[in-house]
């Protein structure tokens, strides 16, 4: 994909603008005043900047900054008069800086490394400053050589009174304008180079039946399954993406969406670069203010003041909207981009987002940015991939950032459409002349339709169709219930606060955070590792709390329940842990341990400490309050805890370990304390169940002996 310029780059000049430029030159040349549109790139103070002691050092540092994307070009007017060189604001014509000709030490055109066109170099020495300033400019309509000749001609005229060189330079300038040459149209201006655009690529097309194919963008979760990832032939005719138009058009759409994503990243990087330059300029101004002895403005402060001006509120809103838009685009293109992938680019966006939130005064401003809404896929991508630090930032931004658009009230006004700094617009129509839809808005509409289609159908008179009632009864049998083992406090609108011993209905258990519904009908996400299977509420189980309808007549008395059929419980069902036999209970405990281990590794990342591989489950020590320290140590090693955790807790007895609370374990083992507490809780539950079984067996044995005794008495 091609690299495009950023917001500071000047667009290709139109014929009218070139005409106006020529007209301005023709009117000012007679007064020995010329004016040029330039981009100011950077200013170095020799001796003050790190490693910048000569002009050559400044040129090398500029090349390094450009390769790192740290150059922020700022458009302005450079005016040359018989006595001075002045820098003006291009809009207000306000004077930013003024350099007398006797203060200009050097004027030259330099060729930075990796560029095909030269830059204008000005070295200015103010009488009040010990070291000179080095300025780099880039000509927009004329090359740096012509501007250099004009300034050097003015210097010669100022010092010797000879004006032939400047007159020749002005004639050359007019001749160049007549030819309509434009450096900006021939070569990209020196500026920030996007670091992401060069590596975002669509996935390699696969050859099917000798014909190159492009992966289409899936609209549903099922479309992302591995066996369907490369399906490129005819799709569902009702699909809002492909329909009968074929995979070739889908490939073009994917490329268009990737191009939009690249431009979004360009603008985000430009905004962050502007924030960094603004902060640097502010620090320099504050440093100069502290060391100033007079009230006279020092050299270069006009440029610094302009550069230190922070972005406006509208600009902050615009970049936050683009970040939200990028989240949805990344989720949509998850199967179409690689090197880097969507999750990797997701982490890349959180750095700028953190900086923007900090510089805008905290998360309150970002909370007010409601549009565009996030797609359901974007929320899923975020929830499944953010790190703990990123999750803290993400959840602090409120419901408009953590809830999908289908769960938020609709916003008034036209749909959001990004406007890019450099004026680029995506193609409006496809090769067949049909208008392209905005990819994020289309995905939001698709999710809304899917939500409406999945809603329960009710007749006009309020009575449900008998066939639908039968389906609901079948659905009721397949519903899944869980028991909450710990309190959990929601941190955002998408999560649900639950209490210990709450019985919850599971709505979605495909990821690490399960979507559940409580007895009040409230829905939200909770972590899966605080839940255990449960048979569900014993009263009115045939109706969900959210769907329960009161009737005017009391229900008839229930019929005698048939004898329960002994069926082996399935591990994906809602059977209670208490109803399992010891071997199955052990299997569930093992599954829970594996899930917790996976969660710990995912949260810790690749750089986390390695763990001891757990030994065979059959040889696992049985931990109880009566266990000695050696048994506790062996149990910790078997569970795969790190050596630090084993050394810290391996000196405790079973009773001491069982008495510790989660906060105390976290204080001793910050990284693994919570997991130790979870494992101890599971072990405690297993012990309690075994004791209940033993008590039940004792009662049954006593009852059996009593019955046998009564039988013997009757026989006698």
Curated annotation (Swiss-Prot):
It comes from Mus musculus (Mouse). Residues 175-194, 203-249, 404-472, 528-582, 600-628 are annotated as: Disordered. Keywords: Coiled coil, Cytoplasm, Phosphoprotein, SH3 domain. Signal peptide: none annotated. Residues 682-713 form a coiled coil. This is Epidermal growth factor receptor kinase substrate 8-like protein 1. Residues 477-536 form the SH3 domain. Belongs to the EPS8 family. Residues 435-446 have a biased composition (Basic and acidic residues). Stimulates guanine exchange activity of SOS1. May play a role in membrane ruffling and remodeling of the actin cytoskeleton. GO terms for molecular function: actin filament binding. The modification Phosphothreonine is found at residue 187.
């Amino acid at each position: 994909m091609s690299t495009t310029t950023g917001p500071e780059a000047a667009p290709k000049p139109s014929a009218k603008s070139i005409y106006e430029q020529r007209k301005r030159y023709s009117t000012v040349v007679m007064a020995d005043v010329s004016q040029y549109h330039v981009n100011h790139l950077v200013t170095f103070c020799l001796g003050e900047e790190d490693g910048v002691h000569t002009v050559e050092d400044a040129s090398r540092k500029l090349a390094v900054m450009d390769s790192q994307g740290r150059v922020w070009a700022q458009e302005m007017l450079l005016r040359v008069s018989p006595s001075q060189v002045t820098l003006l604001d291009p809009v207000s014509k306000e004077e930013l800086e003024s350099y007398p000709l006797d203060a200009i030490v050097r004027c030259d055109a330099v060729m930075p490394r990796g560029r095909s066109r030269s830059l204008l170099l000005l070295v200015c020495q103010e009488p009040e400053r010990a070291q000179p300033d080095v300025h780099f400019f880039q000509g927009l309509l004329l090359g740096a050589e012509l501007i250099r000749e004009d300034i050097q001609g003015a210097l010669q005229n100022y010092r010797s009174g000879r004006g032939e060189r400047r007159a020749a330079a002005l004639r050359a300038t007019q001749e160049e304008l007549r030819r309509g040459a434009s450096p900006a149209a021939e070569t990209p201006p020196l500026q920030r180079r996007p670091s992401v655009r060069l590596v975002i690529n669509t996935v390699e097309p696969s050859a099917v039946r000798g014909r190159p194919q492009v992966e289409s963008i899936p609209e549903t979760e099922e479309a992302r399954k591995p066996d369907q990832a490369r399906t490129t032939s005819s799709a569902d005719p009702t699909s809002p993406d492909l329909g009968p138009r074929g995979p070739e058009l889908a490939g073009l759409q994917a490329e268009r969406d990737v191009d939009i994503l690249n431009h979004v990243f360009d603008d985000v990087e430009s905004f962050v670069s502007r924030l960094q330059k603004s902060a640097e300029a502010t620090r320099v101004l504050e440093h100069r203010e502290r060391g100033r002895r007079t009230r006279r403005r020092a050299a270069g402060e006009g440029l610094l003041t302009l550069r230190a001006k922070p972005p406006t509120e509208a600009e902050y809103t615009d970049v936050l909207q683009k970040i939200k838009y990028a989240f949805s685009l990344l989720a949509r293109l998850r199967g179409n981009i690689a090197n880097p992938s969507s999750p990797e680019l997701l982490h890349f966006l959180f750095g700028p987002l953190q900086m923007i939130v900090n510089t805008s005064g905290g998360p309150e401003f970002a909370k007010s940015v409601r549009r565009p809404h996030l797609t359901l896929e974007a929320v899923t991508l975020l929830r499944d991939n953010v790190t703990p630090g990123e999750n803290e930032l993400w959840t602090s931004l409120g419901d408009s950032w953590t809830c999908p658009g289908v769960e938020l009230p609709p916003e008034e006004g036209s749909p959001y459409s990004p406007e890019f700094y450099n004026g680029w617009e995506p193609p409006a129509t496809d090769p067949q002349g049909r208008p392209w839809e905005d990819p994020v808005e289309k995905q939001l509409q698709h999710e809304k339709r899917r939500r409406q289609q999945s809603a329960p159908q009710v007749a006009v008179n309020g009575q449900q169709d008998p066939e639908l009632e039968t389906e609901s009864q079948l659905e009721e049998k397949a519903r899944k219930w869980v028991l909450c083992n710990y309190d959990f406090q929601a941190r955002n609108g998408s999560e649900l606060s639950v209490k210990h011993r709450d019985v919850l209905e599971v709505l979605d258990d495909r990821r690490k955070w399960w979507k559940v519904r409580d007895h009040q009908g409230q829905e939200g996400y909770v972590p899966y590792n605080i839940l255990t299977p449960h048979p569900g509420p014993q009263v009115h189980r045939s109706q969900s709390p959210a769907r329960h309808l009161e009737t005017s007549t009391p229900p008839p008395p229930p019929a005698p329940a048939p004898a329960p059929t002994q069926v082996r419980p399935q591990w994906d069902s809602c059977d209670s842990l208490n109803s399992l036999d010891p071997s199955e209970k052990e299997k569930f405990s093992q599954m829970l341990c594996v899930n917790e281990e996976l969660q710990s590794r995912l949260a810790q990342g690749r750089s986390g400490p390695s763990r001891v591989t757990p030994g065979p489950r059959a040889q696992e020590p049985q931990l109880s309050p009566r266990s000695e320290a050696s048994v506790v140590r062996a149990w910790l090693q078997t569970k795969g805890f790190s050596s630090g955790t084993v050394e810290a807790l391996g000196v405790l007895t079973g009773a001491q370990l069982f008495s510790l609370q989660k906060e105390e374990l976290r204080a001793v083992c910050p990284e693994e304390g919570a997991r130790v507490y979870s494992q101890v809780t599971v072990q405690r539950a297993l012990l309690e169940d075994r004791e209940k079984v033993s008590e039940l067996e004792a009662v049954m044995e006593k009852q059996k002996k009593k019955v046998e005794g009564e039988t013997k008495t009757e026989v006698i």
